[in-house]
């Protein structure tokens, strides 16, 4: 894993963008796809550095997933990004049939998840995405705590062959994880105590 890490407040989408560039530098099979949100999903630098490995599908989230599934069948590792309200929101059927049931190595990236969407408003608030994706067979769901964990999650996803959903947020948040021990499916203890246990996603 690269030595680059986040120490100042940053959005998890920033960690995704940095992590995607890092894994693409190491693995030529990594490709990026976006549904007309390249800047918002922090894929602009990836597009500039790897123009032959970036596909802009436009406002077509169902096609985003279909193209990603085809690339996975061809041996690529596609990271397909849009706002969570649109993917999985608008593309759940394609995710269900083409990715989850087929157990394809597709990484679905949902940005602006949750209620803090800034000026984008209530129509862009993805509140059901975790439930939608957790109900699918073979699908792994990852919700990083901060930008550094999001960066590490991208490395873990690139090395994992299962379909996965990476849920990202819009606002800048403090960095609370500082070690390189992110593992898919394993919790991290951030602070030891004896009086109470807080389990957060």
Describe the function of each predicted region.
Residues 1-167, 172-173, 181-186:
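Thiamine diphosphate
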Residues 27-28, 191-196:
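A short, charged/proline- and glycine-enriched loop
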Residues 198-201:
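Glycine-rich phosphate/diphosphate-binding loop of Rossmann-like nucleotide-binding domains
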């Amino acid at each position: 894993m690269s030595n680059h890490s986040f120490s100042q407040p940053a959005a998890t989408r920033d960690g995704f963008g940095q992590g995607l560039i890092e894994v693409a530098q190491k693995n030529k099979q990594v490709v990026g796809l976006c549904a007309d949100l390249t800047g918002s999903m922090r894929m602009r630098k990836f597009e500039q550095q790897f123009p032959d490995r970036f596909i802009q599908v436009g406002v077509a989230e169902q096609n985003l997933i279909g193209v990603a599934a085809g690339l996975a069948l061809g041996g690529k590792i596609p990271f397909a990004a849009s706002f969570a309200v649109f993917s999985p929101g608008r593309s759940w059927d394609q995710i269900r049939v083409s990715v989850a049931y087929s157990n394809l190595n597709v990484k679905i990236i949902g940005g602006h998840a949750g209620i803090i969407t800034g000026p984008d408003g209530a129509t862009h608030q993805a509140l059901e995405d975790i439930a939608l994706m957790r109900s699918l067979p073979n699908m792994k769901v990852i919700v990083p705590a901060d930008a550094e964990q999001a960066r590490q999650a991208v490395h873990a996803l690139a090395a994992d062959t299962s379909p996965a959903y990476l849920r990202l947020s819009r606002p800048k948040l403090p960095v609370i994880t500082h070690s390189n021990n992110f593992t898919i499916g394993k919790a991290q203890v951030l602070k030891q105590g004896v009086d109470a246990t807080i389990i957060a996603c």
